[in-house]
């Protein structure tokens, strides 16, 4: 991801130059102006690294269009970059249920979302994800009704989210989990990982093993952004 000062985080690629080539050639020229604006605004936030990588967003938009997604769910919103790109990709009468524990960060990007004319598609829920998902499941009409889910929240709970998401997702629906390679630390011995990254590194390893063994979904783990795992519910 490119910082507000022009610096480049190469992500999982071997060279900054190659990552910049991908961004400059294929990602930034296709990125809508409202997304550029929100990405730049996000980089002024102290926790900007929590934002969705633009190349991840581009791939998600492609998936959304490919499956003709209309009803989607987002777990973890932050400033709303992925939320905005989803709203732009789904039809005018499409709906997104967006869950985040912090409304303040969502409101950072809200003026840009409103300016883009897509706020009417969003139902924002300020809550921890697990109780919000359990509440959704109490309504039988929500079960197997979502076309697409994006998960970018507390990594320790990914397996717990997954069980609930599978109840909400229609057969053939797609769920994308972000940060499943955690800066490449999943391939490192634990004693070589910085203490600040170890908890989520361990959580990612555990989730990766869990999802690899889940016969209910087809999966593909990709070195896009900080690593994403794409699952299709059978």
Curated annotation (Swiss-Prot):
What Pfam families does the entry give?
Methyltransf_3
The molecular function terms of the Gene Ontology recorded here are:
caffeoyl-CoA O-methyltransferase activity; metal ion binding
**Record bears the keyword Methyltransferase:** yes
UniProtKB keywords: Lignin biosynthesis, Metal-binding, Methyltransferase, S-adenosyl-L-methionine, Transferase
Q: Which reaction does it catalyse?
A: an 8-hydroxyflavone + S-adenosyl-L-methionine = an 8-methoxyflavone + S-adenosyl-L-homocysteine + H(+); 4',7,8-trihydroxyflavone + S-adenosyl-L-methionine = 4',7-dihydroxy-8-methoxyflavone + S-adenosyl-L-homocysteine + H(+); 3',4',7,8-tetrahydroxyflavone + S-adenosyl-L-methionine = 3',4,7-trihydroxy-8-methoxyflavone + S-adenosyl-L-homocysteine + H(+); 3',4',7-trihydroxyflavone + S-adenosyl-L-methionine = 4',7-dihydroxy-3'-methoxyflavone + S-adenosyl-L-homocysteine + H(+)
In short, the EC number is 2.1.1.-
In what pathway does it function? Flavonoid metabolism
Cysteines joined through disulfide linkages? none
Tissue-level expression reads: Expressed in leaves and trichomes.
Give the coiled coil ranges: none
Keyword Transferase tagged: yes
Going by the record, the broad EC class of this enzyme is transferase
Q: Which residues bind S-adenosyl-L-methionine?
A: 52, 74, 76-77, 82, 100, 129, 154
Q: Which cofactor does it need?
A: a divalent metal cation
Give the UniProt family note.
Belongs to the class I-like SAM-binding methyltransferase superfamily. Cation-dependent O-methyltransferase family.
Functional description taken from the UniProt entry: Cation-dependent phenylpropanoid and flavonoid 8-O-methyltransferase involved in the biosynthesis of polymethoxylated flavonoids natural products such as nevadensin and salvigenin, aroma compounds which contribute to the flavor of sweet basil, and exhibit pharmacological activities such as anti-allergic, anti-oxidant, antibacterial, anti-proliferative, and anti-inflammatory effects. May also act as a flavone 3'-O-methyltransferase. Catalyzes S-adenosylmethionine-dependent regioselective 8-O-methylation of flavonoids; mediates likely the conversion of pilosin (PIL) to nevadensin (NEV).
Q: What's the protein here called?
A: Cation-dependent phenylpropanoid and flavonoid 8-O-methyltransferase 1
Name its species.
Answer: Ocimum basilicum
């Amino acid at each position: 991801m490119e910082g507000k000062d022009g610096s480049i985080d190469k992500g999982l690629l071997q060279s900054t130059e190659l990552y910049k080539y991908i961004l400059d050639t294929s990602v930034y020229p296709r990125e809508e102006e409202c997304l550029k604006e929100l990405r730049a605004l996000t980089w002024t936030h102290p926790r900007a690294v929590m934002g969705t990588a633009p190349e991840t967003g581009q791939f998600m938009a492609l998936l959304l269009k490919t499956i003709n997604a209309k009803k989607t769910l987002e777990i973890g919103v932050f400033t709303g970059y992925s939320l905005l790109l989803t709203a732009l990709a789904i039809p005018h009468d499409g709906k997104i249920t967006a869950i985040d524990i912090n409304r303040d960060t969502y409101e950072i990007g809200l003026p840009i979302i409103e300016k883009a004319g897509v706020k009417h598609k969003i139902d924002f829920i300020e809550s921890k994800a697990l109780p919000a998902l359990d509440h959704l499941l109490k309504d039988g009409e929500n079960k197997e009704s979502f076309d697409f889910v994006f998960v970018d929240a507390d990594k320790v709970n990914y397996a717990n989210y997954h069980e609930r998401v599978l109840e909400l997702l229609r057969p053939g629906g797609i769920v994308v989990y972000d940060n499943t390679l955690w800066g490449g630390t999943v391939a490192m011995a634990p004693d070589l990982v910085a203490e600040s990254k170890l908890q989520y590194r361990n959580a990612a390893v555990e989730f990766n093993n869990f999802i690899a063994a889940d016969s209910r979904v087809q999966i593909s783990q990709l070195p896009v952004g900080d690593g994403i795992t794409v699952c299709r519910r059978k």
